[in-house]
């Protein structure tokens, strides 16, 4: 049996192996949180999907002078948010591993706006809080047009990056 998946799938594979079933487990999760791996199957594809969304949202945010809170997957791990937030030039990245104060965040956004930055992108891992609630507070406290975008399951699909296609093609 070949099992491709995250923690739950690989735990199930382990149970099968304990019963004597021949099992091969491949780490496949967009969270990239399987111990002993550098990158899991699906992580790079998810990062590219999120980065594409950030770039599109920056276009609309800058054109309309908005704050956009983008929620990405990551209940326990903020790696997707960190990697894509850095690559996409997010003003703030909120992850479950690091506590934050939404009032302080609002003050920082107001300060940036007053200093001439007319838009902000905030990337939020879902485990760090509710994008809808955080967006509402930011909008109320800053007086800026604040929108929320939740990518949801679109992050879990997509074409593999070119590197993987060529690396694993049978020649």
What are these regions (language model features)?
Residues 4-5, 13-15, 22, 43-145, ...:
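Accessory alpha-helical/coil subdomains and C-terminal extensions
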Residues 26-39, 62-63:
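Acidic/polar active-site rim loop that often engages polyanionic ligands
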Residues 36-47, 158-165:
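Short beta-strand elements at the ligand-binding edges of bilobed clamshell
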Residues 29-34, 100-102, 153-156:
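Short gly/pro/ser/thr-enriched loop/turn and capping motifs at secondary-structure boundaries
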Residues 139, 144, 151-170:
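Catalytic, metal-anchored helix/loop core of enzyme active sites in primary metabolism
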Residues 1:
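Anion-binding (especially nucleotide phosphate/pyrophosphate-binding) glycine-rich loop
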């Amino acid at each position: 049996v070949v099992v491709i998946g995250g923690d739950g799938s690989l735990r199930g594979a382990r149970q099968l192996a304990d019963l004597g079933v021949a099992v091969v487990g491949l780490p496949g999760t967009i969270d990239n949180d399987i111990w002993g791996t550098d990158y899991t199957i699906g992580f790079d594809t998810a990062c590219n999907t999120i980065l594409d969304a950030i770039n599109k949202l920056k276009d609309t945010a800058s054109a309309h002078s908005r704050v956009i809170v983008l929620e990405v997957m990551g209940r326990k791990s903020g790696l997707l948010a960190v990697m894509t937030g850095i690559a996409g030039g997010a003003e703030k990245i909120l992850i479950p591993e690091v506590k934050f104060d939404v009032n302080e965040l609002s003050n920082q956004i107001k300060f940036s706006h007053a200093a001439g930055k007319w838009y902000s992108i905030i990337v939020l891992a879902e485990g760090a809080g509710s994008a809808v609630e955080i967006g509402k507070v930011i909008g109320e406290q800053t007086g800026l047009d604040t929108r929320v975008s939740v990518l949801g399951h679109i992050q879990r699909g997509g074409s593999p990056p070119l590197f993987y296609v060529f690396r694993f093609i049978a020649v």
